[in-house]
Amino acid sequence: FVISNLGEGYKATNFPDAKGWVGAGTKRGLPKAMTDFQITYKCIVEQKGKGAGRTAQHIYDSDGKLLASIGYENKYHDRKIGHIVVTLYNQKGDPKKIYDYQNKPIMYNLDRIVVYMRLRRVGNKFSIKTWKFDHIKDPDRRKPIDMDEKEWIDGGKFYQRPASIIAIYSAKYKGYKWMEMNGLGSFNTEILPKPKGARDVIIQKGDLVKIDMQAKSVVINEEPMLSEKSFGSNYFNVDSGYSELIIQPENVFDT
């Protein structure tokens, strides 16, 4: 891998000499095994020209067996129809696809997009959240587009093994032009049991909060969080003229 995309991404440069999908990846262990977790994979897709490509984050258990994968793929070399796929694997390695979301048509004509894919497991409930940005028109990532969420229940508890290892992987299809897809980041968090009566922490020290009045969006660390806003539902419909935003507690946030 080499640093690419204006110093933000990491690009695969050497691919195996084989047929079909060929790729390169890097793997590392987590500081500790995680029972409940939230894992987000962030990638950039160069889709100005047509081509086939895929990139994914793989999650392994303590025995090194594949537990889950979250990834983005454009499998048709002559079309720009990408989709996000989440797959779980049982102890035997049998795959179970629980999410397959195809880009909305508004994404087809964009030259460069940033894709976020999040998989969260708490108990036997898996939550998936995906969103994207137009990296050309919105380089600061203030206006999330093509957002989607889904929940899936592991009724048989076949996918409850602790997560211990992660890997980032990028691939192209041998014989066809590569639609370049590069990883931008992997964010892996253990979810600890919440004490009784405790509230979820939405904003923490160091978080970057962006409120866009024109786009009517609230983004925290590039994640759409409008559903978590505590201000009135008519906040974005204030008449033109003087308005004031009050942030509490005072002297805490750097604005």
Residue ranges and their predicted role:
Residues 1-95:
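Secretory/extracellular carbohydrate-interaction modules
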Residues 1-22, 32, 47, 145-216, ...:
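Ligand-recognition surfaces built from glycine- and aromatic
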Residues 27-39, 105-113, 237:
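Extracellular/lumenal carbohydrate-interaction signature centered on repeated Trp-anchored short motifs
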Residues 39-41, 107-156, 217-220:
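Carbohydrate-binding surfaces in secreted/extracellular proteins
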Residues 65-69, 95-97, 135-149, 225-227:
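Surface-exposed loop/edge segments in extracytoplasmic proteins
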Residues 66-81, 115-121, 164-169, 209-212:
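Broad, structure-driven detector of short, well-ordered beta-strand segments within folded domains
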Residues 84-118:
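Short, aromatic/His-centered strand-loop micro-motif at the edge of beta-sheets
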Residues 251-255:
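C-terminal interaction-tip segments
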